[in-house]
Each structure stands twice: as structure tokens, then as C-alpha cells.
Design a protein with these regions (language model features):
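Hydrophobic alpha-helical segments and their helix-loop junctions in multi-pass secondary transporters
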Residues: 105, 139-142, 158-186, 202-208, ...
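Hydrophobic, membrane-embedded alpha-helices of multi-pass small-molecule transporters
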Residues: 7-30, 93, 97, 167-177, ...
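Extracellular loop-to-transmembrane helix junctions
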Residues: 7, 29-63, 67, 85
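Hydrophobic transmembrane alpha-helices that form the core helical bundles
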Residues: 54-62, 70-120, 290-315
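Membrane-interface loop-to-helix entry segments
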Residues: 108, 112, 128, 132-174, ...
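Membrane-interface "cap" regions at the ends of multi-pass membrane proteins
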Residues: 1-33, 51-56, 392-403
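Selective recognition of specific alpha-helical transmembrane segments in multi-pass small-molecule
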Residues: 45-55, 101, 160-170, 232-259, ...
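TM-loop-TM module centered on a large, flexible mid-protein loop between adjacent transmembrane helices
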Residues: 70-83, 241-297
Length: 409
């Protein structure tokens, strides 16, 4: 049995599952519920291939590069395209995930102010106080150190997944098929909704940062066989991810009237808030919903924040060097944390719509790195020509459609 499936492969499957299923899962039903049943069914059909193909392509891109053992995406880009384009891709990578950090911080603030609004009047001073508290507490957890923070995040993965599964099963008793069958019209508006839903799907199923670590680990352990090992794990992990996420999405949308989903979308909160808005929602659901939403988004925030701060530190170092100033890494890192935290606080106070940020900025930028860069490279780099497949071509087209939302959506 060990030859068929090892303990190590099981652990990596859990790692991929834990990073893919989280805060993004809470936003997907909001967009799909607003878009209509046709878009939901199309998403269900394409979820697995459009999760597997792009992440597989990124693995191929990393593993095919002739870089030193510990280098991931950045090293592969530099190997194929040189330092200048490598710096541009690194900057895009930083911006894409900095926006993810902002989305989670805004959504956490909104979830907390939504609960406070039941007891007190929310004005700009209250929002600023909550925003400051959110940024401060998340930074305090972050400053505990990578090891301690990752241990806390790892501990939270299974309770969160168990809650999603429990809630999906619990809501079966409230299913109303008419909520979906009443939205089955297909027209030009439906096509538009399919188009603008692509970035939210990309955002919800993407877990780009861990792919670099995953590919490096497989290469260190299996050498030339690394890609085969990656595909073996990814096929199984992504099937489980897609089935569980889609079960959660369908269960929510079969239970929640569209009006509540639209209210949650406008307020920039998650599907758990939409559930708690319903007049017949039990007290335990309202309480657990806000706790789980905040914990899930905090986990995802911190998981992304490490990479954002590392990227910001490098950008600060480079900028200071260009003006003739050389500071220690500790100084550059501290300045980066202050700058990122300050911008995050301001954005939380401004309160842009979370879904709009996903389909206008974050989703398209992630698509550039995950969908377009590795697949387009198979047409630009002769060494990657063997990886040209129908799946990679479809991934490239979907990536271009996703990016087009940023400019025309």
C-alpha cells in the first residue's frame, strides 16, 4: 500500500487542502449567488480542471528551470527571462498578494462592525478604532515569529474544515431547490456574469504561494521524478478540494434567498454573515459564523502576510540602495511592516467593496502569475515546448479573460 500512496503524499494533500480551503471559500458563494444558477453550474463543471491545470503548469514551470535547489517561482522567472523581467514578475506577485491582505483585513473589519452595529451606531470613529485594532492584533500575532504563527495556523486548519463540512450537512434540512431552479434563464447578462465571476473563482481556488514550496520539496526528494509526484498528489487533493468547496457553495445557495446574499455582497462580508442575517437563523449559527469567518480570514491573512512583508522588505532595500542609503535588514523589515500596516489601516477605514477588489485587482493579478505566465511560457521558451497541451491553452485563454475583467469589467 505504501507504494501506491505514502504518508508524505497524504501530508502534502492536507497541506494543499488547508491552504486552498479557507477565507476565499467564504467569498465564492457571494459572487456565484449573485451571478445566478447557470453560472454556478458552469463553475461546478470547470472547477477541477481550472484548479488542476494552472497549478500543474506552475509546477512544470518551476521544475523545468535550471536553478539551485531552494529557488522557486522567482528563480525560475529569472532563469527564463532575466533579472529585469524577473523583477517585474516579482513586483506583480507582491501587488497581487498585498491586495489579498487588504481584502482580508477589510472583510474582518466589516464582519466585526456588522456585529457591533446590532448594539451601537457605527460612525467613522468606531470604524477607525476597529480597523486599528484589527491591524494591531494581526501584527502582534505575526511578530510572534514564523514558527509560532504557522503552528497556530496549522492547528486551525482542521477545525475550520470540519466546520465547513458540518455547516454544509446542517443546511441540507433547509434546502429549497426553487432558489436555484428559479434562476435558470440564459441571456447576455448570464454571459457577463460568467465573465466577471472568473476572477472570484481564481481567487477562491488559488493557493499559489505554497506551490513553490511544494515543487521545491518534490524536486529535493525525487529529482527527475518530481513532476510525476506533484501531479499524483495534485489530482487527488484538487478533486477533494473542489468537491468539498462546491458542496459548501451549493448547500449555502440552496438555503439562502438571493436578497440576503446581495446584502452581504454590498456590505463586503462573507456568506456566513448572509446566513446570520436570515430571521430564522439560530443564535449559535450567528455566533459561530462570525467567529469562524474572522478566524478563517485571519489565518489566510497571516499566511499571505509573510510573503508580502518579505517582498516589501526587498523592495524597500532596493529603493534605499538606489538613493545611496544602506540599512540593516531589521530596519528594512520594520519599515516595511509600518508601511504595509499603515496602508492596510487606511484601506480598512475607506472600506472598498471586497468582491469588487477581487474581480478588479486581485483575481486578474493572480491569473497573470498562475494562469498566464507558465502557460504562455510554453510558446515563448523553446525548452518548455513539450508542455504545450490543450489544457494549458484553455488555462491561458481563461487567464486572459480573467485579466480582461480588470480593464473592461
Amino acid at each position: 500500500m505504501s507504494k501506491i500512496w505514502s504518508k508524505d503524499e497524504t501530508l502534502w494533500s492536507f497541506a494543499l487542502y488547508g491552504t486552498a480551503v479557507g477565507a476565499g471559500t467564504l467569498f465564492l458563494p457571494i459572487q456565484l449567488g449573485s451571478a445566478g444558477a447557470i453560472v454556478l453550474f458552469i463553475t461546478a463543471l470547470v472547477a477541477w480542471p481550472l484548479t488542476y491545470w494552472p497549478h500543474k503548469a506552475l509546477c512544470q514551470f518551476i521544475l523545468s528551470s535550471k536553478t539551485s535547489a531552494g529557488e522557486g517561482i522567482t528563480g525560475a522567472v529569472t532563469h527564463y527571462y532575466g533579472k529585469k523581467i524577473g523583477s517585474i514578475i516579482t513586483a506583480l506577485y507582491f501587488i497581487a498578494f498585498f491586495v489579498v491582505v487588504l481584502i482580508y483585513a477589510v472583510a474582518i473589519t466589516n464582519s466585526l462592525t456588522e456585529q457591533l452595529a446590532k448594539h451601537i451606531q457605527i460612525d467613522i470613529r468606531i470604524r477607525m478604532t476597529v480597523s486599528f485594532g484589527v491591524v494591531l492584533i494581526l501584527n502582534m500575532i505575526f511578530l510572534m515569529g514564523r514558527h509560532a504563527t504557522l503552528r497556530v495556523m496549522g492547528f486551525l486548519v482542521f477545525p475550520l474544515i470540519a466546520y465547513f463540512l458540518f455547516l454544509s450537512l446542517y443546511l441540507i434540512g433547509s434546502w429549497q431547490p426553487s432558489l436555484l431552479t428559479g434562476q435558470m434563464s440564459f441571456d447576455s447578462h448570464t454571459l457577463h456574469q460568467v465573465w466577471i465571476s472568473i476572477p472570484v473563482m481564481v481567487f477562491a481556488f488559488s493557493h499559489t504561494p505554497i506551490i513553490s514550496t511544494f515543487a521545491i520539496d518534490r524536486r529535493e526528494n525525487f529529482g527527475e521524478q518530481a513532476m510525476g509526484k506533484c501531479k499524483k498528489i495534485m489530482k487527488v487533493a484538487y478533486l477533494i478540494i473542489c468537491l468539498s468547496v462546491l458542496f459548501f457553495v451549493f448547500s449555502c445557495l440552496l438555503s439562502i434567498p438571493p436578497a440576503y446574499i446581495e446584502d452581504a455582497r454590498n456590505e463586503g462580508v462573507t456568506i456566513l454573515s448572509a446566513l446570520s442575517m436570515m430571521p430564522n437563523a439560530p443564535a449559535w449559527l450567528s455566533i459561530s459564523g462570525i467567529i469562524v469567518a474572522v478566524v478563517a480570514m485571519s489565518k489566510s491573512f497571516l499566511g499571505t502576510y509573510f510573503g508580502v512583508i518579505e517582498g516589501a522588505t526587498e523592495m524597500v532595500r532596493t529603493t534605499l540602495q538606489q538613493v545611496g542609503v544602506k540599512k540593516s535588514r531589521a530596519f528594512n523589515r520594520a519599515l516595511s511592516i509600518m508601511l504595509v500596516s499603515g496602508i492596510t489601516f487606511i484601506i480598512c477605514c475607506i472600506n472598498p467593496n471586497a468582491i469588487s477588489m477581487i474581480y478588479a485587482i486581485s483575481g486578474p493579478l493572480i491569473a497573470m502569475i498562475l494562469f498566464i505566465m507558465p502557460t504562455l511560457s510554453t510558446y515563448l521558451i523553446p525548452a518548455l515546448k513539450p508542455y504545450r497541451t490543450v489544457g494549458n491553452f484553455i488555462t491561458l485563454v481563461v487567464g486572459l479573460l480573467c485579466v480582461s475583467v480588470m480593464f473592461f469589467g
